[in-house]
Regions:
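Short, small/acidic-rich helices and loops at N termini and domain boundaries
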Residues: 1-53, 301
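Glycine-biased, small-residue-rich flexible motifs in mid-sequence functional cores and linkers
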Residues: 41-43, 47-311
Length: 311
């Protein structure tokens, strides 16, 4: 509404508003804007633009950032946390489901916000693992914000919102326009919010690999779970590994260590020493100490670790 007012008043607009967006906003009648705002208020839907305080900071830097995001749940979870994307096929095997669930659960328990698309299959499995851990998770839809697709995930959506997570969409409530390409378009948002993207299981031709392409464009590291050479649903992940587009994902620590994430989703650092300057052995010692100190913090006095690092 603020941006709309600026357009009508003829004031200068932020650079991120393209000419096409300006033209659209100038053509929209004030009554339409007011009606949309009321509809969102009635459905407890929040609206974010790049000028909003809760707009995801990680999306602001994208060349194709969304001008408007509609959301339900808790917008406060969209900033100030550690975010990892978990995606994969909508028709997973038991192996893929188990890998997705175990990896997502471990990362969520470490304070990571799992990001995915609330779709059937591994998207839902990633969100469900975060809910199981009692942690926040963020979902991006390719539909109107007040429509859950598939409908089987309606309960999951309610549960993740109750835990302080959020569901976002570029499409307003009751949107009935063409859906061609909307799910592919939302893939860039999953990749954009994520600090790293994990692929649990995927075929060679799938929307999952579209998300991987966006992650590569945005400079996000990609991880893939190795699969059986006899499984069609692992052909995509194995190809990512074979061509060097992804790193092997065998344990959650493969991602957590790369992102320097300690228990609680905090940055893994040692006073006076940058992590990038430590040897692998030093990182292992520091990670182990961080984990043990976090688990014992509530059971008694703690001590701070100081050493003259020879590495």
């Amino acid at each position: 509404a603020e941006l709309y007012g600026q357009v009508k008043a003829g004031r200068n607009l932020p650079e991120y508003l393209s000419a096409k967006a300006r033209e659209f906003m100038q053509a929209v009648a004030p009554a339409q804007m007011a009606g949309l705002k009321k509809r969102c208020d009635d459905l407890n839907i929040f609206i974010l633009t790049p000028d909003s305080a809760d707009y995801p900071q990680r999306l602001r830097d994208l060349p194709d950032l969304p001008l408007v995001l509609y959301g339900t749940g808790n917008p406060a979870c969209l900033n100030g946390r550690r975010y990892v994307g978990m995606v994969g096929t909508r028709r997973p095997t038991k192996y893929g489901l188990s890998a997705c669930r175990d990896l997502s659960l471990t990362m969520a328990e470490r304070g990571v916000v799992i990001v995915s698309g609330l779709a059937e299959g591994l998207d839902g499995a990633g969100h469900r693992a975060a809910v199981e851990a009692g942690q926040q998770t963020v979902a991006f839809l390719g539909t109107a914000i007040n429509k859950t697709f598939p409908a089987v995930n309606v309960t999951l959506r309610t549960e993740l919102e109750a835990l302080g997570g959020a569901v976002l969409s570029e499409y307003p409530p009751d949107y009935t326009g063409k859906m061609t390409g909307t799910f592919l378009a939302r893939n860039r948002l999953i990749a954009g919010l994520s600090e790293a993207l994990c692929v649990a299981e995927a075929r060679t031709r799938s929307g999952t690999l579209n998300t991987v392409s966006h992650a590569e464009e945005y400079g996000r590291p990609v991880f893939a779970v190795p699969g059986s050479i006899y499984s069609p649903t692992s052909e995509g992940t194995n190809e990512l590994l074979r061509t060097g587009r992804a790193r092997a994902l065998c344990t959650a620590d493969d991602v957590l260590d790369t992102l320097h994430i300690a228990p609680g989703g905090t940055e893994l650092v040692q006073e006076g020493v940058m992590l990038d300057e430590l040897t692998p052995n030093a990182r292992t010692v520091l990670a182990s100490w961080s984990a043990s100190s976090a688990s014992s913090a509530s059971s008694g006095p703690s001590c701070r670790l100081f050493w003259a690092a020879p590495w």
